[in-house]
């Protein structure tokens, strides 16, 4: 659905050039929720604005739904943008217009008739659960309700892609969850491709199918949400993952699946990650019974990565031949 090929963005100034994006390549599949996470100034907002050409790349190509946006003239680009909705951290609603009229606004600009606008706006009000707020003004709404209006307005043109630029950053945790639940529902109902820019790993964990990590204008890591969470490769990614695990482990434990081998005297420390159905299986007690080993659990956590249960555990063993046999058995069963 979305392809970025060697996309670059440089801001030129007398004080010095800023290379916001450097040879960025990214493929986002149709119908998935794709997260782009990075620290402030990493280039993530520049990247998402290059997707709909709010920022014109200095170099490279941008394709959306098979069309090259970077090769279009202004008229062609205006038409192509109707397939790309966008919501922002700040809701950007028109204070003098009602909820209904805010949602209708992009359709009015396109010259669509009032009867057709009504057919589109009413279902959108129901979709974002504001069917009883159509006559309200933005000043009468909560932050979460304002963002729901923003989402409905972004969907008014029936786009294939929804870009979300820090859409939950200004919301409290409970409201954030309700907005993320809404986006997941919209993704399923409409088969909508959603791109989420965020600095919050909790957001990625909750909704994303795949994720890319951006740092200093470069994509440094990319993969499925499960892979990135359970096997982070880069220091920045590890810091993001650590921020939601709320624990500092020795460096040799910062890997996934099975990593044996932080030694502590005559003992081994092993880190195991159970994903999906295995997170609920009695694996640790099974190891004790089968291999007759003493296990000390030094860290354990049960979490959820979108729809998948996740359970990272760190275990301490007395070194013994049966421990090596046990670890080999785990590796064979997980491969």
Regions found by a protein language model. Give the residues of each.
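ABC ATPase NBD coupling module
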Residues: 13-18, 69-85, 109, 114, ...
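Helix-to-loop junction immediately C-terminal to a conserved catalytic motif
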Residues: 52
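Conserved ABC ATPase "signature" region
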Residues: 67-68, 104, 108, 115-132
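Short coil-to-helix segment of the ABC ATPase nucleotide-binding domain corresponding to the Q-loop/switch region
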Residues: 97-104
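Conserved signature/switch motifs of ABC ATPase nucleotide-binding domains
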Residues: 136-139, 156-157, 164
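A short, surface-exposed alpha-helical micro-motif characterized by mixed small hydrophobic
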Residues: 204-206
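ABC ATPase "signature
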Residues: 222-223, 231
